[in-house]
Amino acid sequence: MRKSLVCAGALALVLGMPSGTVQAQGMDDLHSKVRVGGRVCMADHFHDGSGTGSTRARAQAAAIRAWIDFTAWEYGGRWGSYGAAISKSMSCSGGPGNYSCSTSARPCRY
């Protein structure tokens, strides 16, 4: 019982940390990295994002925003640049008034 309480307390402490603290503790070091130009990129780790919208452009923007938000939350703002990411893919479906898009990319930072 005591071990469970200690584990629960540690989990609550980690979950309560701001994303900058997570990055400062090296959570991005869980993945191997490679240099691509002036960037440092995750070697084989992809992040995904999905979104919907009334137009294809809005659905794509929502998918990119989801990718940015999750990546920055997990590794910190420096990793949350979709413009810096590599190996990007985007797929969309639907039609006028109801589009859905998904994107995948390897995070990079400058």
Language-model segment annotations:
Residues K3-V6, G20-Y110:
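Domain-level marker for long, solvent-exposed, non-transmembrane regions
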Residues A8-G16:
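Bacterial N-terminal signal peptides
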